[in-house]
A protein has these predicted regions:
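Class I S-adenosyl-L-methionine-dependent methyltransferase catalytic core
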Residues: 1-194
């Protein structure tokens, strides 16, 4: 027997639990979405030297609004509005941290837009067929350290512990000096924790 029940636990996630009953065996499968993780200032600071300053950036996923503010603080011209990425086409270069549960849709939309982009995604994205088929000519920037995202629950920041996976900056049509670039601290950027 298989049945699904909606679940909400501690406002930390949503999804469903599927319970499969078998003789002497009960298996629980949990489908969870964790998309409310915000980009810290340091994540954009680390790659700001590679983001084109002559283009208007579109921070396409609004979140709590701070990511666009961080990019503006770093000196970029940024469009950061709370609009649907799948229905709008803004700016000249997409710079964003999309909801990871929506990556296939996000990547298809990025390909459709045809704009240069810098997108933070898990390293494992590189090994997926849908990604390879859409962007065989991708370039990546490897961060100096693991990105520690800020977790929001109902609009409030909550302690989230250390991030358990690595992310890369996936870049398309930026003309980076190499296909794999290792990020370093740039001397002309002030270091700031946020």
């Amino acid at each position: 027997m298989v049945h699904s029940e909606p679940i909400i636990r501690d406002n930390d996630f949503y999804g469903f639990i599927e319970v499969v009953d078998r003789p002497k065996l009960s298996v629980v499968i949990c489908m969870v979405k964790h998309d409310d993780y915000m980009t810290p200032f340091s994540a954009w600071e680390d790659v700001s030297a590679y983001i084109p300053r002559h283009l208007t950036l579109w921070e396409a996923f609004y979140g709590d609004g701070t990511s666009g503010a961080h990019l503006t603080e770093l000196g970029f011209d940024v469009i950061h509005e709370d609009v649907d990425f799948f229905e709008h086409d803004l700016g000249e270069c997409v710079v964003t941290n999309p909801p990871f549960s929506e990556l296939p849709r996000v990547l298809a939309r990025l390909r459709e837009l045809g704009k240069p982009f810098v997108v933070i995604m898990p390293c494992s994205t590189l090994t997926t067929r849908y990604f390879r088929d859409l962007f065989p000519d991708i370039q990546v920037i490897v961060p100096r350290r693991r990105i520690q995202f800020r977790k929001l629950v109902d609009g409030e920041e909550v302690p989230s512990g250390r991030c358990s996976f690595d992310c890369l900056y996936f870049c398309w049509r930026l003309g980076l000096p190499r296909d794999v670039v290792f990020s370093t601290r740039w001397p002309f950027l002030p270091s700031r924790q946020k």
